[in-house]
């Protein structure tokens, strides 16, 4: 399993090699029923569970894709991870989530 961290280093480990920048991207459509429910909650207040679940799913998929790409590069970890969100489409019906970081090889510090 590839370790993922937002920090520039991993406690207890030394970075031995920088493999390069790695990304994971997910573009997801939001369905009509979630839109309707979110619109009603926007009018009356409250949280949109449908959107929140879609956001979590997309974020987890982007991180998993980034981990797979890092593993293919021979990395043990991804450091300095950043996650970005963007709403796309003429009707703002698409959500793009991008996870990026630096793929590295690490060794346990003595």
UniProtKB/Swiss-Prot annotation:
Write down the InterPro entries for this protein, in alphabetical order. UPF0145_dom_sf, UPF0145_YbjQ-like
Write down the superkingdom of origin. Answer: Bacteria
What HAMAP family does its record include? UPF0145 (MF_00338)
Give the family, as the similarity comment puts it. Belongs to the UPF0145 family.
Protein's name according to its UniProt entry? UPF0145 protein BL0562
């Amino acid at each position: 399993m590839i370790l993922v961290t937002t920090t520039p280093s991993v406690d207890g480990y030394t970075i031995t090699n920088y493999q390069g920048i790695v990304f994971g991207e997910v573009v997801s459509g939001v369905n009509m029923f979630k839109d309707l429910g979110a619109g009603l909650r926007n009018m009356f207040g409250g949280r949109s569970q449908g959107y929140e679940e879609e956001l979590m799913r997309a974020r987890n998929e982007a991180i998993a894709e980034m981990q797979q790409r890092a593993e293919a590069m021979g990395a043990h970890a991804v450091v300095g991870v950043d996650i970005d969100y963007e709403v796309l489409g003429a009707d703002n019906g698409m959500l793009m989530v991008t996870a990026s970081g630096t793929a590295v090889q690490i060794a346990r510090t003595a």
